[in-house]
Amino acid sequence: MPNNNIRTRFAPSPTGYMHVGNLRTALYTYLMAKHEDGTFILRIEDTDQGRYVEGAVDVIYNTLRETGLLWDEGPDIGGPVGPYVQSERMGMFKQYAEQLVAEGKAYYCFCTEERLEALHAEQRAHGEMTHYDGCCRDLPKEEVEKRLAAGEPYVIRQKIPREGVTGFDDMVYGHIEVNNSEMDDQILIKTDGMPTYNFANVVDDHLMGITHVIRGSEYLSSTPKYNLLYQAFGWNIPNYIHCPPVMKDAQNKLSKRNGDASYQDLVAKGYLTEAILNYICLLGWSPKGEYAEQEIFSLADLVKIWTPDGISKSPAIFDPLKLRAINAEYIRRLSPEEFLAKAEPWIDSAVHTPINKKLLCANLQPRCEVLGEIPEQLDFFDAMPEYDVSLYANKKQKTTPESAKEALEALLPVLSDEALDFNDRDTVFDACKAKAEELGKKNGWLLYPLGIALSGKQRTPGGGTDLACMMGRETTLERVKAAIEKLNG
């Protein structure tokens, strides 16, 4: 495969969800390619059938499409180096492993699970790190052939050099070296004939012409083994970009198993996809130069400015408050029509009576940080909640339950006027304001009680006249009359 352009790949395992760290890897991989007019490849690594979850491939497709991380080659659209599903590439891996055996760079290992367990138990008892002891590393060729002919189970192991060092250069962490003596003879082909994750990764990356490998820093320790495989085959080694972990706090990694949010969870809570992607990009990466102080970036912006030298070595702490702030900014930037379209499903889940959604959204949008918190603000529309008349007391508005009764009685004829257009919020407000002036009172003295009478709450998405126009004349008059009756005791 010619390497005349940058080729990156996102290679997830279909385990059922897209956690934040995975999505960040996908994003950085996409940006690395697109910033350089390169090719972004999607490869599904489904060889670990024990972790495979039905429908998980669709989760991967849907997440990448929703976030705009569209691939140039992949399982559904094909490409010049397919197939792009690892389980469909099984035939080739064993051939490559056997090539290494023939060249003396790998070997058949016949050690049983029982022997390995006993070996590791003994090593642990002596305070040693568990490792393979090379028992089958130098078996005579005749013995190997005899045991293979007898059908004895085996794995194929890489023959790691016992001396020297293996080093590599990472675009984030710099030059790293490991003593070969510290590395185990890793398994390439398992007893069932399936390749190990590491081996399949190297072979597939080579055959697909991958020039830049972007992954989590947990793979730093495996990279020397990857490089020894590239060297054994005489293949070009890709550029490595290892990203710092995403942490829940200083001690704990973000983990779905610990109940931490996946991408789907965040969307289900009402975070906007664009905001999630923006925030995730900033987890361990910082813009440079004129963009250093900027926090809001569209995907198109990121394609223009993203470079790997902005990636930090330090772990990134997932900050829910920062995500909220970025999400709130994205909500504020929506047009009224866009906000209504996004908020409407949440409104409909909470309100089943006719209301003026356009006016409701005009009041919600400046205050809303997360769409999922909209329903709890609307629980009074369908049915008036129980409330205590002490709510009418407000020092700032200079109201008491007694003055509230007076205010509502004064408002009743205003709101009952058939000529008053409840579809025009300003008209209703002006009529109420005129009544306040007539009484020699401030607007709040009249309108604060109206808000309580219509909602039974101090905090609502809009003031009294807003709520009246959202609910309409009939509901407004019913609730004002009920409030007067309640205040009469």
List PLM regions with ranges.
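Charged substrate- and nucleic-acid-binding regions of tRNA-handling and nucleotidyl-transfer enzymes
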Residues: D426-N488
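Conserved phosphate-binding loops in nucleotide/dinucleotide-binding enzymes
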Residues: P83-S87, F110, I189-K190, M208-Y219, ...
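Structural motif
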Residues: M18-V20, L266-E274, K313-D319, H352-L360, ...
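Residue-level signal for inorganic ion chemistry
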Residues: T29, I60, L100, G104, ...
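Active-site cores that bind ATP or allylic diphosphates and position pyrophosphate for catalysis
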Residues: A102, Y107-H242, K248-L254, S262
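Glycine-rich phosphate/pyrophosphate-binding loops
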Residues: K34-D46, F199-H212, F233-M247, T460-D466, ...
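Small-residue-rich helix-loop
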Residues: P336-L439
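N-terminal Rossmann-like or analogous alpha/beta NTP/dinucleotide-binding catalytic cores
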Residues: P2-A125, S222-W235, A275
